[in-house]
Amino acid sequence: MKQLESFEIPRTVVFGPGAILKIPDIVSGLRVGKVLIISGKSATQQYAKTVASLLSGYSAEILKYDEVELEKSGFDLIIGVGGGRPLDMAKVYSYVHKRPLIVVPTSASHDGIASPYISYILAEKVKRYGKVVASPIAIVADTSIILSAPRRLLRAGVGDLLGKVVAVRDWQLAHRLKGEEYSEYAALLSLSSYRIVVANAGKIGNFVREEDVRALVKALIGCGVAMGIAGSSRPCSGSEHLFAHAIERRLEGAEGEAIHGELVALGAIVMAYLHGINWRRIKKAAGAVGLPTTLKQAGIDLDLAIEALTTAHTLRPDRYTILGDGLSASAARKALEDTELI
C-alpha cells in the first residue's frame, strides 16, 4: 500500500488581457496588511508600481530582487513581478518567512512562472535555508503584458518546454533502473505541454497574437502544476536541464550569455539523441520558433559544450538520467556531431 501523499498547487490562476487588474480581488480574500513586491531591474519595475497602485489600501513596498534582505521580516504577503530572478527571489522570501506568494510574470521564458521550485544557480546560493519549495497561491499572467516582452524571452519559453519529453524519459529510466517514485499523471501533464508547442511551433513562433502567448502560458503553467503534483521538478527537469545548468554555472554574469530556455532546447536535442527519441522533431520545432539550433548560433564554445556533457551528471548525483555516470569526451563530441549542433 502506498503512503499518504500531499501536494500544493496554485488555488487561483488568472490569465488573459488585463489579468493584472484582478490582483485586488485576490488579495481581498487574504488577511494581509503589509505587502512586499519584488521586481526586476528594468521595465518590470513599472509593472510593480502598477501592482502597488492597485493595492493602495495596503502598505506596499517595492524592492528589486537584488535588494531583498532575506533576514528582514514583517510582511504578510509576497508578490513577485517580473521574469525568472524576481519570481525566484519572491519564492525564497516566501519560503523563509512562511508567507503566501502571488506571482505576476511579465514574460514567459521558462516554467518557473508556476513552479514551486527555483533555479539551480539560486538554489546553490541559498541552500543554507534548506530546499526552497514555495508554491504560489495565485498566478496572475496578463497576456497583454507578456506579449510585449522581448521575443527572445518568449522563444526561450518554448525551448524550456521542448525539454519536457527528455525529462519524462529520464524519470521513467530512473523509475525502472533505480526504483525512483514515478507519477504517471504528472508525467502526462508535462508531456502535454511539450506536445502543445511542438504541434503549434510554426504558428506561435512569431508571438504577434494574444492567443500565441496564451498557448505558451498555459503550457508553462501546466508544467508548474506537474511539478507540484510530483513533489519535485522531476517531470520537467532532466538531463537537458543538467546540460543547461553546467553551462550557466560557467557563464554566470558573462556578457551576452545564452538564455536558459535556449540552452535547454540544445540540451534536449542531444539528450533525445542519446535516448533514441526523435531529436530531429525537437530541432525542427526549435528552428520554427527561431531558437538557436547550433552551438555557434547560441554563442557556446565547443569545448564548453563537451565539458558540460561530460560533467553535467555531477551537478545532481541524486537525479539519475540518460547521462548515467557521465559521457566520455569522444561520446559527447559524437553526439554533437550526429545532431549537427556543430
From Swiss-Prot:
GO cellular component terms attached to this protein's record: cytoplasm
Pathway: Membrane lipid metabolism; glycerophospholipid metabolism
CDD domains in the record: Gro1PDH (cd08173)
Cofactor(s) this protein cannot do without: Zn(2+)
Co-factor binding comment: Binds 1 zinc ion per subunit.
Binding site for Zn(2+): D160, H241, H260
Assigned keywords, A-Z: Cytoplasm, Lipid biosynthesis, Lipid metabolism, Metal-binding, NAD, NADP, Oxidoreductase, Phospholipid biosynthesis, Phospholipid metabolism, Zinc
Keyword Cell membrane: no
GO biological process terms held by the UniProt record: glycerophospholipid metabolic process; phospholipid biosynthetic process
Subunit composition and interactions: Homodimer.
Family per record: Belongs to the glycerol-1-phosphate dehydrogenase family.
Protein name per its UniProtKB record: Glycerol-1-phosphate dehydrogenase [NAD(P)+]
Gene that this polypeptide is encoded by: egsA
